[in-house]
Amino acid sequence: MTSIIFSAKDIFEQEFGREVRGYSKVEVDEFLDDVIKDYETYAALVKSLRQEIADLKEELTRKPQVSSAPSPSHPDPIDVAASSSMTNFDILKRLNRLEKEVFGKQILDNTDL
């Protein structure tokens, strides 16, 4: 990770050499003031983000570990489908037998016609 070269104080105390046709001292000072404000804002942001990371890591260590195994309260969908289809098959067999009992005489009577 790259380290920070300048602090806000370093920028504030930076002295520039003067030349005959140099930059406007007022403009340079205003620009450096803005840079200092940015550095202070970034430093505060980095500090708050580091604190948030530390808080989240601490919260993560306090939480119990969640296992990847399926919980017993949720049945396997394949097992549910298999038992459901067997149940449906049993119901259809029973319904067929009951229909033969109830309507069997009517079916036999209609075949005589």
From Swiss-Prot:
GO terms for cellular component: cytoplasm. Residues 61-82 are annotated as: Disordered. Residues 36-63 form a coiled coil. The keyword Cell cycle applies. It is found in: Cytoplasm. Pfam families: DivIVA (PF05103). Keywords: Cell cycle, Cell division, Cell shape, Coiled coil, Cytoplasm. InterPro entries: Cell_cycle_GpsB, DivIVA_domain, DivIVA_fam. GO terms for biological process: cell division; regulation of cell shape. It comes from the Bacteria. NCBIfam families: DivI1A_domain (TIGR03544), PRK14127.1 (NF010725). Divisome component that associates with the complex late in its assembly, after the Z-ring is formed, and is dependent on DivIC and PBP2B for its recruitment to the divisome. Together with EzrA, is a key component of the system that regulates PBP1 localization during cell cycle progression. Its main role could be the removal of PBP1 from the cell pole after pole maturation is completed. Also contributes to the recruitment of PBP1 to the division complex. Not essential for septum formation. Belongs to the GpsB family. Forms polymers through the coiled coil domains. Interacts with PBP1, MreC and EzrA. This is Cell cycle protein GpsB. It comes from Streptococcus pneumoniae (strain Taiwan19F-14). The lineage of its organism: Bacteria, Bacillati, Bacillota, Bacilli, Lactobacillales.
